[in-house]
């Protein structure tokens, strides 16, 4: 392979302590922090139904620095299924990942932590939820893809609105 000409790669490299560090985002580990499945009405709640249950899904993302360039990102998924005002199941998953992020400009850190990291975690968390509901006697709950960029923008807008209220 021929060497590529070197150019200004600001998007891929940033100055860190006077040294040029290639920008990288690495998953160091992934883990289940908490998993809970409840089917309070079993076995009656497992019977066949004429209509699909209503399912409410909530998603949350949190990130915490671990020191240096390492961050712990937590993706929380909760789902509650109800039919005829009876809870069929509740499932909650807190799925974490430890990420090493280096070489990116500071203004890229929040989008990386709240968009890219959960985007990498989501397929694994989705499968855990599907397996938990299937193992609980229900059809697997296949959560639709999540737009983490939109969630992040909404979060920023909510924080800005709170700041404006506090200043008033």
Curated annotation (Swiss-Prot):
Coiled coil: none annotated. It comes from the Bacteria. The keyword Chaperone applies. One of its GO terms (biological process) is protein folding. It is found in: Cytoplasm. Residues 1-21 are annotated as: Disordered. Pfam families: SecB. InterPro entries: SecB (IPR003708), SecB-like_sf (IPR035958). GO terms for molecular function: unfolded protein binding. One of the proteins required for the normal export of preproteins out of the cell cytoplasm. It is a molecular chaperone that binds to a subset of precursor proteins, maintaining them in a translocation-competent state. It also specifically binds to its receptor SecA. PANTHER family: PROTEIN-EXPORT PROTEIN SECB (PTHR36918:SF1), PTHR36918. Homotetramer, a dimer of dimers. One homotetramer interacts with 1 SecA dimer. Belongs to the SecB family. This is Protein-export protein SecB. It comes from Chelativorans sp. (strain BNC1).
């Amino acid at each position: 392979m021929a060497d590529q000409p070197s150019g200004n790669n600001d998007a891929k490299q940033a100055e860190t302590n006077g040294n040029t560090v290639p920008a990288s985002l690495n998953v160091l580990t992934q883990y289940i922090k908490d998993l809970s499945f409840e089917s309070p009405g079993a076995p009656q709640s497992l019977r066949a139904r004429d209509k699909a249950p209503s399912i409410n899904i909530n998603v949350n993302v949190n990130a915490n620095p671990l020191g240096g360039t390492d961050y712990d990102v937590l993706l929380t998924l909760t789902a509650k299924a109800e039919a005829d005002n009876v809870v069929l199941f509740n499932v909650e998953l807190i799925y974490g990942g430890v990420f090493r992020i280096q070489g990116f400009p500071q203004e890229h850190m929040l989008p990386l932590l709240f968009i890219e990291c959960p985007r990498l975690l989501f397929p694994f968390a989705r499968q855990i939820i599907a397996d938990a509901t299937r193992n609980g006697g229900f059809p697997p709950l296949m959560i639709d893809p999540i737009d983490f960029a939109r969630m992040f923008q909404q979060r920023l807008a909510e924080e800005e609105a709170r700041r404006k209220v506090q200043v008033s």
